[in-house]
Amino acid sequence: VAVKKIMKPFSTPVLAKRTYRELKLLKHLKHENVISLSDIFISPLEDIYFVTELLGTDLHRLLTSRPLEKQFIQYFLYQIMRGLKYVHSAGVVHRDLKPSNILVNENCDLKICDFGLARIQDPQMTGYVSTRYYRAPEIMLTWQKYDVEVDIWSAGCIFAEMLEGKPLFPGKDHVNQFSIITELLGTPPDDVINTIASENTLRFVKS
């Protein structure tokens, strides 16, 4: 088994909510491509331990150790999308999908993990989610109305990284990240830009 330690999860309201959210989701999500929770216990110091299945490594370690052959890329992508389909059908948005949150075992079985930032689908979402390289533009542009498409964007970034062996959008900060995306994909159309609520962000995009 694997044990995930969460130190002092009750020390702040944010940590407490995040821990409760992850525990609640892991308790109910049951799928071949989603990590399963086998047990949980609290230490005398009030640290929480999640006991899960052990897979051995993660996709980030694989990508930094060697190039992936085509058949492995296909199989990994299939399992990622299969897991996401299940998670999304349960009304959940992961919001922090990245190679280090995708576990792999010696048989190339893959499981999505770390649901600490996941949320039940809601018309209003917070923008502070997801590691920068895999963050969808609508999150960077401070949109609060987004849905499962942010996970699909992250999956696309991971797919490109598996093909190229390096991150597709390795931004140094939010501004540089958005610039790299628009250089490759172009500027969003006006009807999309005009939905941006923040005036500062709107001026930046139009510039």
Swiss-Prot record:
Residues spanned by motif TXY: 126-128
KW Cytoplasm (keyword) present: yes
SUPFAM superfamilies recorded: Protein kinase-like (PK-like)
Entries under SMART domains matching the protein: S_TKc
Active site location: 96
Post-translational modification: Dually phosphorylated on Thr-126 and Tyr-128, which activates the enzyme.
Localization: Cytoplasm; Nucleus
Known catalytic reactions: L-seryl-[protein] + ATP = O-phospho-L-seryl-[protein] + ADP + H(+); L-threonyl-[protein] + ATP = O-phospho-L-threonyl-[protein] + ADP + H(+)
Molecular functions (GO terms): ATP binding; MAP kinase activity; protein serine kinase activity
InterPro entries assigned to the protein according to its UniProt record, in alphabetical order: Kinase-like_dom_sf, MAP_kinase, MAP_kinase_CS, Prot_kinase_dom, Ser/Thr_kinase_AS
Residues bearing PTM Phosphotyrosine: 128
UniProt keyword annotations, A-Z: Activator, ATP-binding, Cytoplasm, Kinase, Nucleotide-binding, Nucleus, Phosphoprotein, Serine/threonine-protein kinase, Transcription, Transcription regulation, Transferase
Cofactor annotation: Mg(2+)
Residues reported to bind ATP: 4
Primary location group: cytoplasm
Residue positions where Phosphothreonine is found in the record: 126
Its EC number(s): 2.7.11.24
Domain of life: Eukaryota
Documented activity regulation: Activated by tyrosine and threonine phosphorylation.
Gene Ontology CC annotations of this record: cytoplasm; nucleus
Described function: Proline-directed serine/threonine-protein kinase involved in a signal transduction pathway that is activated by changes in the osmolarity of the extracellular environment. Controls osmotic regulation of transcription of target genes.
Family: Belongs to the protein kinase superfamily. Ser/Thr protein kinase family. MAP kinase subfamily. HOG1 sub-subfamily.
PANTHER family linked to this entry: MITOGEN-ACTIVATED PROTEIN KINASE
Description of its domains: The TXY motif contains the threonine and tyrosine residues whose phosphorylation activates the MAP kinases.
Protein name: Mitogen-activated protein kinase HOG1
Native source species: Fusarium culmorum
Gene: HOG1
